[in-house]
Swiss-Prot record:
Residue span of motif Bipartite nuclear localization signal: 198-216
Compartments where located: Virion; Host nucleus
Role: Encapsidates the negative strand viral RNA, protecting it from nucleases. The encapsidated genomic RNA is termed the ribonucleoprotein (RNP) and serves as template for transcription and replication. The RNP needs to be localized in the host nucleus to start an infectious cycle, but is too large to diffuse through the nuclear pore complex. NP comprises at least 2 nuclear localization signals that are responsible for the active RNP import into the nucleus through cellular importin alpha/beta pathway.
Coiled-coil blocks: none
A Gene Ontology biological process term: symbiont entry into host cell
Organism from which the protein derives: Influenza A virus (strain A/Swine/Wisconsin/1/1961 H1N1)
One Pfam short name: Flu_NP
Major location category of this protein: virion
Designated gene of the protein: NP
Official protein name in the record: Nucleoprotein
Length: 498
């Protein structure tokens, strides 16, 4: 865990490894990616998918969801103990789309979970390869982050919907391990903690007995993860208070919401990694790419290079704009839902528009939609430049942002000033400043007030030409600072519903 003084790189978390050198990390990440690719190829063979059908992102997502379901131990156990009508706990499945006589058709498939586990293990040298499963979860989480807004969830826990830039990873399953914790935003963890505290307030036995002891350990562990994301001593000290509380209640909820707000200016470190759909890895493996030998990094040039030369298709609803669908998936691939649009647009080499202006719904197709009326089109996932993904909040400073989203959480390590509406955020800090955390609160507010809009974050960091694999010549972009920077501005996206 970050706070225990052992900072592992998130490639190491990703591969469950101990301290390794760079080459070993690149090889083990490559091994993980290659395993996903081999699994995908085998599933396409079993399902008799044509090359074109195998490149359809909707088919990729169905296959990914099947393997996640096959390995979801707790849910599988639950399903076996609580049988529900018409649901076979030993089977998993989903929609597969096939091209028949010039039309797309949906076929619902069912598979034995045991069979899918066999295919997955076989593709991963006989191992369970949990790292690969987590990688797939993070890709789904990034896709959700780009597609949906979490207004309802924020309001339910007493947070402000404008804090959406803190909600990265809010749909990641609990079982996503250290790699999952690394990509969760401050707001996501605050929300999990508040839910826990609220249960404790409503249920006297929540913290008691043997179960309560386990709950308490989980609570403290989550507090430590959140503490490890904060970069200032005062924020960390407040987290110690929350963690050590004998009987967490409303005071702790207040403290957590205060900390979440403070993270809009004093940003937490949240890891970003480019996680691509399984079909992209499958295509590369099928064309003879040896990921383990070549090595791979989730935060380097490799994902950009993969996307430069892989063709992925998507089903498009009759009134959707294929270019907008491409933007959505591009953002998901690079974990850039909360990045400044000016930065994303510069790297992509195309204008990136806010969520509210996109004429596209999510990638997945509901079972009641008519597939025959849909066409498929190529997703444009290429980029003009590449940049290193960051795991820090890029703190120094802030600047004017928009009505919908009042801060960003940077994805790319690229010099810019971070858009941010100081007046809006500071307005939330009037009032409650007494109690046991008052000195820390005062200190945090002071730091927020002294943050200067002109300051540059990621000083001297730039983007790179795609031919510059060793990242030797940074190109530092200049941005029009008055331009709209946030994605969820004026938002009308659908809510995320499980």
């Amino acid at each position: 865990m970050a706070s225990q003084g052992t900072k592992r790189s998130y490639e190491q978390m990703e591969t469950g490894g101990e301290r390794q050198d760079a080459t070993e990390i690149r090889a083990s990440v490559g091994r993980m990616i290659g395993g996903i690719g081999r699994f995908y190829i085998q599933m396409c063979t079993e399902l008799k998918l044509s090359d074109y059908e195998g490149r359809l992102i909707q088919n990729s997502i169905t296959i990914e969801r099947m393997v996640l379901s096959a390995f979801d131990e707790r849910r599988n156990k639950y399903l076996e103990e609580h049988p529900s009508a018409g649901k076979d706990p030993k089977k998993t499945g989903g929609p597969i789309y096939r091209r028949i006589d010039g039309k797309w058709m949906r076929e619902l498939i069912l598979y034995d979970k045991e069979e899918i586990r066999r295919v997955w293990r076989q593709a991963n040298n006989g191992e369970d390869a949990t790292a690969g499963l987590t990688h797939i979860m993070i890709w789904h989480s990034n896709l959700n982050d780009a597609t949906y807004q979490r207004t309802r969830a924020l309001v339910r826990t007493g947070m402000d919907p404008r804090m959406c830039s803190l909600m990265q990873g809010s749909t990641l399953p609990r079982r996503s391990g250290a790699a999952g914790a690394a990509v969760k935003g401050v707001g996501t963890i605050v929300m999990e903690l508040i839910r826990m505290i609220k249960r404790g307030i409503n249920d006297r036995n929540f913290w008691r007995g043997e179960n309560g002891r386990r709950t308490r350990i989980a609570y403290e562990r989550m507090c430590n993860i959140l503490k490890g994301k904060f970069q200032t001593a005062a924020q960390r000290a407040m987290m110690d208070q929350v963690r050590e509380s004998r009987n967490p209640g409303n005071a702790e909820i207040e403290d957590l919401i205060f900390l979440a707000r403070s993270a809009l200016i004093l940003r937490g470190s949240v890891a970003h990694k480019s996680c691509l759909p399984a079909c992209v890895y499958g295509l590369a493996v099928a064309s003879g790419h040896d990921f383990e030998r070549e090595g791979y990094s989730l935060v380097g040039i490799e994902p950009f290079k993969l996307l430069q030369n892989s063709q992925v298709f998507s089903l498009i609803r009759p009134n959707e704009n294929p270019a907008h669908k491409s933007q959505l998936v591009w953002m998901a691939c690079h974990s850039a839902a909360f990045e400044d649009l000016r930065v994303s647009g510069f790297i992509r080499g195309k204008r990136v528009v806010p969520r509210g202006k996109l004429s596209t719904r999510g990638v997945q197709i509901a079972s009641n939609e008519n597939v025959e009326a849909m066409d498929s089109s190529t997703l444009e996932l290429r980029s003009r430049y590449w940049a290193i993904r960051t795991r820090s909040g890029g703190n120094t400073n802030q600047q004017k942002a928009s009505a919908g989203q009042i801060s960003v959480q940077p994805t790319f390590s690229v010099q810019r000033n971070l858009p941010f509406e100081r007046a809006t955020v500071m307005a939330a800090f009037v009032g409650n400043n007494e109690g046991r955390t008052s000195d820390m609160r005062t200190e945090i507010i002071r730091m927020m007030e002294s943050a200067k809009p002109e300051d540059l974050s990621f000083q001297g960091r730039g983007v790179f030409e795609l031919s510059d694999e060793k990242a030797t010549n940074p190109i530092v972009p200049s941005f029009d600072m008055n331009n709209e920077g946030s994605y969820f501005f004026g938002d009308n996206a659908e809510e995320y519903d499980n």
